[in-house]
């Protein structure tokens, strides 16, 4: 059955914009039913057949040559590398902000998106809540993004609680990686930026294990990925954090990276979203890396700002690409007085982590 143009659009929780989708319909192996969310509306659940569709007592795999496995993995990965050697958007860092950005961008099937994540497992710190606890707290109205994804939660007056943070992370990853215009390159590190005539034009990449062992090995030159827009979502400061803005400071494109100041949840989440922007031509900064460059407060174990900051970064990237479906998420220039207040506060002698 042919779908109409209206039915092929996905509604976004970010400013209510509607973006085209390239998803296709498949026949499910389970029956979807409506299940009440605790304190809220329905969520999607599945009731599978009680028995698997094969005989477990005499199960046998189809035969395969080992070389076929090698060829399939290699051919597909090399094809992805060739395809994304010159891409529309490169997202550096696959934490909650980077994944939310990629999800929002992926709704436009004409936009090619590459996500580069140095860890084997994407998701950043969004597999757990605070202090290695399971639950994820999301302040309203960011819960609308959870509704869009179909992630269930318990409701309170001003916030919602997802019973395990991994529910959000696994859901957003499975949704966006199923789309044909997105590729995740995990276990790959970004070592540098491509800069031409004052504009960021891509990233310099290497295998993460190679990048971590430059001091023990001889010359191991990197590779490159050109991009029309780079989104840096490298998180807070640390051994592998805030690398995008640190590199901008190293090469003189920004003057300072003062670091985030002490925790203030109510101020921090609003500021993270508000200050998400294109900091230099060709490079948008999102998530906790924003606090590092602006000296905004530490956010702590709440996650709504990561989601909405990522969505905002996506629409800024769409605007930079000239896409008509972009929501204008630009912000006024930060007042010098406000920026000075952040910077002074962030220079206190304190050791902070996310």
UniProtKB/Swiss-Prot annotation:
Highest expression in developing embryos and green leaves and a very low level expression seen in endosperm, roots, etiolated shoots and immature ears. Involved in biosynthesis of the thiamine precursor thiazole. Catalyzes the conversion of NAD and glycine to adenosine diphosphate 5-(2-hydroxyethyl)-4-methylthiazole-2-carboxylic acid (ADT), an adenylated thiazole intermediate. The reaction includes an iron-dependent sulfide transfer from a conserved cysteine residue of the protein to a thiazole intermediate. The enzyme can only undergo a single turnover, which suggests it is a suicide enzyme. May have additional roles in adaptation to various stress conditions and in DNA damage tolerance. Its EC number is 2.4.2.60. Residues 20-32 have a biased composition (Polar residues). It comes from the Eukaryota. It comes from Zea mays. Substrate binds at residues 97, 117-118, 125, 190, 221, 236, 288, 298-300. This is Thiamine thiazole synthase 2, chloroplastic. Pfam families: Thi4 (PF01946). Belongs to the THI4 family.
């Amino acid at each position: 059955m042919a779908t109409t143009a209206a039915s092929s659009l996905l509604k976004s929780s970010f400013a209510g914009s509607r973006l085209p989708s390239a998803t296709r319909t498949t026949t499910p192996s389970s029956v979807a039913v409506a299940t009440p969310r605790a304190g809220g509306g329905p969520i999607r659940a599945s009731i599978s057949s009680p028995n698997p569709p094969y005989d477990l007592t005499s199960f046998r795999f189809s035969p395969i040559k080992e070389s076929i496995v090698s060829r399939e993995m290699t051919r597909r990965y090399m094809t992805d590398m060739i395809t994304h050697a010159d891409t529309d958007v490169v997202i550096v860092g696959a934490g909650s902000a980077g994944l939310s950005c990629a999800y929002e961008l992926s709704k436009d099937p004409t936009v090619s998106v590459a996500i580069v994540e140095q860890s084997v497992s994407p998701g950043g710190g969004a597999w757990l809540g605070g202090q290695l606890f399971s639950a994820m707290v999301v302040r309203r109205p960011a819960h609308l993004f959870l509704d869009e994804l179909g992630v269930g939660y318990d409701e309170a007056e001003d916030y919602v609680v997802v019973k395990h943070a991994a529910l959000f992370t696994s859901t957003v990853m499975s949704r966006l990686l199923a789309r044909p215009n997105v590729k995740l390159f995990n276990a790959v590190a970004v070592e540098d930026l491509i800069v031409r005539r004052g504009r960021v034009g891509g990233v310099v990449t290497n295998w993460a294990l190679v990048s971590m062992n430059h001091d023990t090995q001889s010359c191991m030159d990197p590779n490159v990925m050109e991009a029309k827009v780079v989104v840096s979502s490298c998180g807070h400061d640390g051994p592998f954090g805030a690398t995008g803005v640190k590199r901008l400071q190293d090469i003189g494109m920004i003057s300072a990276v003062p670091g985030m100041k002490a925790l203030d949840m109510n101020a921090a989440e609003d500021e993270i979203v508000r200050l998400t922007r294109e900091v230099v031509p060709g490079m948008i900064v999102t998530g906790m890396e924003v606090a590092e460059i602006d000296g905004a407060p530490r956010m702590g174990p709440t996650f709504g700002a990561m989601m909405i900051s990522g969505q905002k970064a996506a629409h800024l990237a769409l605007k930079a690409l000239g896409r008509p479906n972009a929501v204008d998420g630009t912000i006024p220039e930060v007042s010098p007085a406000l920026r000075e207040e952040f910077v002074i506060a962030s220079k206190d002698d304190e050791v902070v982590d996310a």
